[in-house]
Amino acid sequence: IQSTSMDQGSLSEDSMNSFIRTLIQAGIWKNKVPKQTARDKDGMQTTVKKAKAESDVIANQDITLGFQPIVSVNAELLRQQRRFSSPRVLLSENTPLEPPPLYLMEEPMVLNRTSRRKRSTEGKSHRGEYSVCDSESRWVTDKTSAVDIRGHQVTVLGEIRMGPS
């Protein structure tokens, strides 16, 4: 399931609680004891469940470390919950082909629809893009030397004679 963004204020607490209850009833949040494969005397693979005490110790360590297991949600369960569909959230079984567009994050009208849009003389901002060379604004006191476009120090001529000499 991929979600691009979420408007958390749009869901009521009761609807979230009922959704969580549905997930629990579907058996998604049940703690399943992991299986371990072992070989018996004949070399055949057998599945062995870990001891309950060991899994309780691991679960207690996970809680103290703040670890939350990754939960897999069946897409059919989400289709049944139509009231949770939102134009701001995209639920899909497939991973997105490209990241979300950044220009939507820069537009003030998209972020806050109640605010008025300011006029911008520069156009759209290009965050993360820099020019090839940075400009410097300072007074030139020495007019006899300069730096050319290749970065070499050159001497500036005071006079340029043109024509036959």
Swiss-Prot record:
GO molecular function terms attached to this record: growth factor activity; nerve growth factor receptor binding
Cellular component aspect of the GO annotation: axon; dendrite; extracellular space; synaptic vesicle
A biological-process GO annotation: neuron projection morphogenesis
Keywords: Cleavage on pair of basic residues, Glycoprotein, Growth factor, Secreted, Signal
Signal peptide limits: 1-3
Main subcellular location: secreted
Compartments where found: Secreted
Cited function: Seems to promote the survival of visceral and proprioceptive sensory neurons.
Family as reported in the entry's similarity comment: Belongs to the NGF-beta family.
Name by which UniProt lists this protein: Neurotrophin-3
Biological source species: Acrochordus javanicus (Javan wart snake)
